[in-house]
């Protein structure tokens, strides 16, 4: 199964350590993570990619992915776009937010009631991974 892991890239990257652990956990479980670059310390634009190249690459990867896992504890226009794009294609989205930041997550994201969307609060990354294990497609909770 192919996972699109989404996380803030240009804004507040306070959850980066959690994103790195999520990436590692997904790969250890045999998932193909298409967006390993979200855990990089150096941004794509700093590596010389243009915004258009980033957009085109990410759209291609969104089309290829089976499920989107998004870290939404900190605001990101890009992550919001990726969630909407995926939802409108009827694909499953799991959004993860630190419990202490849940009220800061966009009301637009917190208000989604579609069947293919889950917003999951977590206290630490181990709890997030445990919840992901039970929610990824193929498990009872996402069907």
Swiss-Prot record:
Task: Note whether Hydrolase occurs among the keywords.
Answer: yes
Tell whether Glycoprotein is among the UniProt keywords.
no
**So what does this thing catalyse?**
a pyrimidine 2'-deoxyribonucleoside 5'-phosphate + H2O = a pyrimidine nucleobase + 2-deoxy-D-ribose 5-phosphate; a purine 2'-deoxyribonucleoside 5'-phosphate + H2O = a purine nucleobase + 2-deoxy-D-ribose 5-phosphate
Which residues take part in binding substrate?
37, 82, 106-108
Q: Which residues form the signal peptide?
A: none
An individual GO BP term: deoxyribonucleoside monophosphate catabolic process
Q: Which family does it belong to?
A: Belongs to the 2'-deoxynucleoside 5'-phosphate N-hydrolase 1 family.
Subunit record text: Monomer and homodimer.
Protein function: Catalyzes the cleavage of the N-glycosidic bond of deoxyribonucleoside 5'-monophosphates to yield deoxyribose 5-phosphate and a purine or pyrimidine base.
Q: Which HAMAP family match?
A: Nuc_phosphate_hydrolase
Its protein name is Putative 2'-deoxynucleoside 5'-phosphate N-hydrolase 1
The record lists the organism as Thermofilum pendens (strain DSM 2475 / Hrk 5)
């Amino acid at each position: 199964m192919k996972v699109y892991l989404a996380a803030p890239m240009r804004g507040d990257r306070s959850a980066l350590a959690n994103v790195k652990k999520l990436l590692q956990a997904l790969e250890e479980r045999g998932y193909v993570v298409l967006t390993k670059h979200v855990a990089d310390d150096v941004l794509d634009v700093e590596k010389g990619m243009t915004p258009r190249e980033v957009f085109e690459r990410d759209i291609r990867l969104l089309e290829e992915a089976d499920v989107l896992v998004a870290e939404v504890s900190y605001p990101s226009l890009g992550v919001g776009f990726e969630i909407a794009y995926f939802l409108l294609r009827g694909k499953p989205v799991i959004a993860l937010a630190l419990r202490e930041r849940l009220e800061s997550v966009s009301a637009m994201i917190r208000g989604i009631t579609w069947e293919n969307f889950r917003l999951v609060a977590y206290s630490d990354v181990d709890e997030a991974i445990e919840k992901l294990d039970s929610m990824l497609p193929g498990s009872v909770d996402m069907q």
